[in-house]
Amino acid sequence: MTFKILSIDGGGIRGIIPAVVLEEIEKIIGKPISSLFDLVAGTSTGGILALGLAKPNPYGLPEHSAHKLVGLYDSEGTNIFHRSFFHKILSLGNLSNAKYPTRGLEDALDRYFGEAMLSETLVDLVIPSYDIEKRLPIYFTSYFAKGRPGFDHKMRYVAQSTASAPTYFKPFKLRTGSDVGHLSLIDGGVFANNPTLAALSEATGSCGARIGNLFIVSLGTGQGARPISLKRAANWGLVG
């Protein structure tokens, strides 16, 4: 039996690109993304999309369509990536502090996820993050959230953990129910911007899928096409 995986890369505001692709898939097939795949992996902005598509409403149906999540970038983008003049002064123009305060991101995630837990997702998820104190990759998975209460966290906390990009947002302190106490988490894109490998590991491990039965859809967020000449690169320094 084919085991279907969706993998969504990180990429900040460019997450609107895979969001639009997923919107078209839902429109053409007429079914929610959560019913089309057995496992969804997402990093950073891709993690927010994955969580959004898997969040249930009170009736056990998807709370957010891909179309609604496309709107997230239009309606919330300016709030998430907003910094006051006062913040610019305190951070010395991003030299001494994160570029953006976390309030805008936290408010947006609260509106979209509320108190929903990772264990409640409509489809199994894998969401990478990174613990800067322990220097270890962290994988939030629905599988462990459902089987081990200590691994279950609010979806909005998981979303903030995978999206706290260094220099843009301060690390997210996630309190745990274990002896560890807390995790100091940053954007999973620092080691797994494309979470396909994490999805493969989860599929063949926790989910018990066979490698020969996997079908993977991997969505990126585009890339810069501006070439850099060898001559220019040869003169790179700290200020130019």
Regions found by a protein language model. Name each.
Residues 32, 112-122, 154:
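Short, structural beta-strand-to-alpha-helix junction motif
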Residues 52-53, 195-196, 226-230:
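A short acidic (Asp/Glu
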Residues 1-6, 37-39, 123, 135-136, ...:
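Core residues of folded domains in eukaryotic genome-function proteins
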Residues 209-240:
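Terminal low-complexity/disordered tails
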